[in-house]
Amino acid sequence: MSMFLAPIHFMVYGKNQLQEQLIAEIAKRAAAEGWAEASALDAYCSREDRPLDAIIDVSNIHGWLSKSIADVEHRLAALVTELLFGHPERLAVLEELAYEVGREQAAPADAGAGELFQYLTTHLVDGMPCDGVNMMRDQTAETFRWDKTADVHSHYWTEVEGSPTVYQALRSRFVAGILSSTDYEVSTADGISFVLQKA
């Protein structure tokens, strides 16, 4: 395992921080809507905003980042599941929040399919890079196809008695927000094989 911080480690941390932003926005909206007390919602949010090199255990970089991913994934699942319990209609509000957080990170409007795929991979939490979750199948100038080789998200949701389909709905809207500045969209028929192409 690496004993030195590299750009890929900062990328992983950046993806985690972006998901932290989504959690914070959901908690903020939930408090404003009166869905829960702000003090209770705070338990799902992290106040850590220091740069990676100021907080990471450099003697265990891989382990520290893996734990950080698990933590942010678990808190998102727990928060959303709690808010939707008995109130499935709230999902539409959360989906719109996910879209807006994604839109704030909008991809370059002139990017091609391959560039957009790479952009998405630097913004979406998908386990550690060594997990190799997304495997390219083929690519053209205007199309990028890949397969998801492992499901690294669902267990966080089932552990809190939530629905993995809720996560997929939020992720889909988040991705749509990122791509909102482009002519592209991501589609899938089975949740395993994906295609990024012009709408």
Locations of regions flagged by a protein language model:
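N-terminal accessory segment detector
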Residues: M1-A141
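Short, hydrophobic/π-rich interface segment
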Residues: T140-G191
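A beta-hairpin/wing motif
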Residues: G191-A199
